[in-house]
Amino acid sequence: MRLKINALLTALFLVLLACKDQKPTETVAMANDTMEPENLIDRGKYMVDVLGCADCHTPKKMTAHGPENDMSRYLMGFDSAEGLPPVPENVPMGPWVLFKGDLTAAVGPWGTSYAGNLTPHETGIGTWTLEQFTKALREAKYKGLEDSRPMMPPMPRHYAYLTDEDIAAIFSYLKSIKPLENVVPGYQPPSTPPKS
């Protein structure tokens, strides 16, 4: 029995010794390393795609395969030129949500909210700083301004957990896309009928 224990301890010692001499594998650049501007923009595009920003911030066009993002209006938010159809009178206010067909506007118990213009035009985020953009995502502050109202649903609140590097990458990408002029209507509280 003692021989078996000694053999087991010796084997364990040799395994641990073998592990000690192993060199760590090469890792991908850490998030806190400084990225080149092109890589930051590429990372930002990746994040915008993965997070589904265009799902709500890009008007859709109907195709043979169903609705698709209208890339000529990429990330311009609710198209103010189209207006919002009226909420049907037979639909009572309640704990439900109605979306415009292209998902750029939502009506619910909080009121009516519109997807913002994320392009670098001055009617979008063109004049924003990285600090404002970070505050908008982290603290859900409208336009990233300290004393502003909260951003309204359906804007996801879990974006607050993005890293500083991911937010900077998203911001860099958004600042690199085509600027589109589009003044999005302001939020309307539930007592105000939706604009049509």
State where each predicted segment sits.
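Bacterial N-terminal signal peptides that target proteins for export
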Residues: M1-L8
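C-terminal motif of bacterial Sec signal peptides marking the signal peptidase cleavage site
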Residues: V15-A18
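Bacterial signal peptide processing site
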Residues: K20-Q22
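Electrostatic cytochrome c docking/interface patches
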Residues: E26-D49, K61-G66, G83, V87
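The canonical Cys-X-X-Cys-His
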Residues: G44, V50-K60, F133, I170, ...
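Short Fe-S-cluster ligation motifs
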Residues: A81-F99
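Axial heme c-ligation environment in periplasmic c-type cytochrome domains
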Residues: K100, A106-G126, K141-E165
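C-terminal capping alpha-helices of c-type cytochrome domains
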Residues: T127-Y142, H158-G186
